[in-house]
Amino acid sequence: MSSNELTERVLVIASGNAGKIREFRQLLAHLPLSVQAQPKDLAVEETGQTFAENARIKALTVAQATGQWALADDSGLSVEALAGAPGVYSARYAASDALRIERLLQELKGIDDRRAHFSAALCIASETNEVLLEVEGRCEGLITHAARGEKGFGYDPIFEVDATGTTFAEMTIEQKRQWSHRGCAFALLDPALQELLHKQNKP
């Protein structure tokens, strides 16, 4: 049975971030899934101490609230010279992407060690309060001294990937899919999710 012959299942993305939802729609386009955004009025409190814990909390909460499978991603930037900050607080470091970038560059002013890594934890949960899949990906790089590139979102313009010498914001969608932390995590999730969907469609 090919993926096109499988019954399409609703998968709710546990996020209100339009850029993140758009990225997941592209990553999941080849699977028999109806990808939807979470309800706008649904707020999930991220109380975990790790990316994996937060992804699990979000996936379980959104799956129960919607009665559908939910995919949650908790990702963030950890800077070595800042003892791993902003870490799980990456999205709450300031009020907007521009302000978050400004704050981080200011905190690294005069610091030579600009090593950093992005982490992405993915979790899929069912409406029956079951964690179906969990994976985590990582991308090594450094923080630039100024923003570079017009694509992407979040900290993308100031994170230069070790393997390419370019920032995420300078990459095409295909390049970012190959090198990003979320792309690495999805490469682990994809075969497991395909297998899960096949099992669900067996009579």
Swiss-Prot record:
One GO term (biological process): nucleotide metabolic process
NCBIfam families with a match to the protein in the record: RdgB/HAM1 family non-canonical purine NTP pyrophosphatase
Gene3D superfamilies according to UniProt: 3.90.950.10
Family: Belongs to the HAM1 NTPase family.
Name of the protein described by the UniProt record: dITP/XTP pyrophosphatase
Listed GO MF terms: dITP diphosphatase activity; ITP diphosphatase activity; metal ion binding; nucleotide binding; ribonucleoside triphosphate phosphatase activity; XTP diphosphatase activity
EC number, as in UniProt: 3.6.1.66
Keyword entries, A-Z: Hydrolase, Magnesium, Metal-binding, Nucleotide metabolism, Nucleotide-binding
Organism for this UniProt entry: Prochlorococcus marinus (strain MIT 9313)
PANTHER family, per database record: INOSINE TRIPHOSPHATE PYROPHOSPHATASE, INOSINE TRIPHOSPHATE PYROPHOSPHATASE/HAM1 PROTEIN
Binding site residues for substrate: 15-20, 75, 153-156, 176, 181-182
Cofactors that this protein relies on: Mg(2+)
Chemical reaction(s) catalysed: XTP + H2O = XMP + diphosphate + H(+); dITP + H2O = dIMP + diphosphate + H(+); ITP + H2O = IMP + diphosphate + H(+)
Entry GO CC: cytosol
The protein's assembly and partners: Homodimer.
Annotated catalytic residues: 74 (proton acceptor)
Binding-site list for Mg(2+): 45, 74
Highest rank taxon of the organism: Bacteria
Pfam families reported in the protein's UniProt record: Ham1p_like (PF01725)
InterPro entries listed in its UniProt record: dITP/XTP_pyrophosphatase, ITPase-like_fam, RdgB/HAM1
